[in-house]
Amino acid sequence: MGVLEREKKTGKVYIETYGCQMNEYDSGIVSSLMKDAEYSSSPDPENSDIIFLNTCAIRENAHAKIYNRLQSLGYLKKRNPELVIGVLGCMAQNLGDDLFHQELPLDLVVGPDNYRSLPELIQRIRSGEHSISLTRLSKIETYDEIEPRVVNGIQAFVTIMRGCNNFCTFCVVPYTRGRERSRDPKSIVREIQDLTEKGIRQVTLLGQNVNSYKEQGTDFAGLIQMLLDETTIERIRFTSPHPKDFPVRLLRLMAQNPRFCPNIHLPLQAGNTRVLEEMKRSYSKEEFLDVVREIRNIVPDVGITTDIIVGFPNETEEEFEDTLAVVREVQFDMAFMFKYSEREGTMARKKLPDNVSEETKSARLTKLVDLQTSISHEQNRARIGRVYSILIENTSRKSEKQLCGRTPCGRMTVFPLPEGRSASEMIGSTVSVRIESATSATLKGGILS
């Protein structure tokens, strides 16, 4: 019997998740792998034997947040020297061994393709090893047969592919998540039907470039058709796609099938063709607008959201104004808007000067946010009087007497809990809601009797 086997012990695992929905899904993968290794989950870092921080690397403030969190966990390590603390996810992959040079209470650094090794790595730490880093990228790992532990609720994320081949100059994802590889479509069908039988009503399909999915001759549109034909899931959503991968067949499926929600996240990033070329986005401003027109022509009641970066290297005021012009023309329902932030290892960091001042970036972001907030408000006001089929997802964050859910096109909607009904019996049901008022972020209405 080997040393590791003799000394093996388990314990309680606490996982704290930062960043995107795929990290949420990956935390479920980690939880499942640890459960298979006879560890139990813990809701509280104070009473845990192992703490994992599943991290993001998209922006600089994501790194700062993790450094601060690790420092704040130092007192637990002092109180219990046998506590194992690990950093997982994209920050782990991006920085690797460098994290051990920061004088942080840290034992493990493990990238997204290496989670199967976590139980073994923990035993190595407990056997006396220090500062273990494992950040190999895999060309094949999809965790296909690992069933993530389901969080209580009526909706779930399902990763269908991992990695990205686009290498946009500002983006760290190809370096932290590796090249594209897709899951077996039959495995995805099985997972989603299993979730449905456990009470899940809505799934969101995930991938760094989700609509480039292709496996065993099945493309993304083919996978959607399989899910519509072979599962009974009530609603299907997806994120994040690339504008270059929107075949007409996919849009027609959306137009013809109410279960495939008319809700598309279409990252613009910038509205000027020269800037888009510097970003290596593989489309021009005009081509992006053509995609939007085709989407709206085939799926008239679609909700379109986006991502936009301001202050990219060498972006002039006139080029920024081009972005504002595209935002006015497209009339996005909502946008995630950010100041450009250099990321270690990206081509933009290596080859382009970060030469737009912080003051200018902030001013541009404020201008963009103000414009989009106004557009979002008008878009929502235009929905007043309409009736939507809403899957009740939860109670409102502001009141237990308010329910909330999203329209098929993705707009968050809140409405009163009917008298004599409990929230627990209503969550998971689908109701017709008439919209009565709107803010820039939320529709408000009432359930039709």
From Swiss-Prot:
Keywords: 4Fe-4S, Cytoplasm, Iron, Iron-sulfur, Metal-binding, S-adenosyl-L-methionine, Transferase, tRNA processing. GO terms for molecular function: 4 iron, 4 sulfur cluster binding; metal ion binding; N6-isopentenyladenosine methylthiotransferase activity. [4Fe-4S] cluster 2 binds at residues 164, 168, 171. GO terms for cellular component: cytosol. [4Fe-4S] cluster 1 binds at residues 20, 56, 90. Residues 11-127 form the MTTase N-terminal domain. Its EC number is 2.8.4.3. It is an enzyme of class 2 (transferase). Catalyzes the methylthiolation of N6-(dimethylallyl)adenosine (i(6)A), leading to the formation of 2-methylthio-N6-(dimethylallyl)adenosine (ms(2)i(6)A) at position 37 in tRNAs that read codons beginning with uridine. HAMAP family: tRNA_metthiotr_MiaB (MF_01864). This is tRNA-2-methylthio-N(6)-dimethylallyladenosine synthase. The gene is miaB.
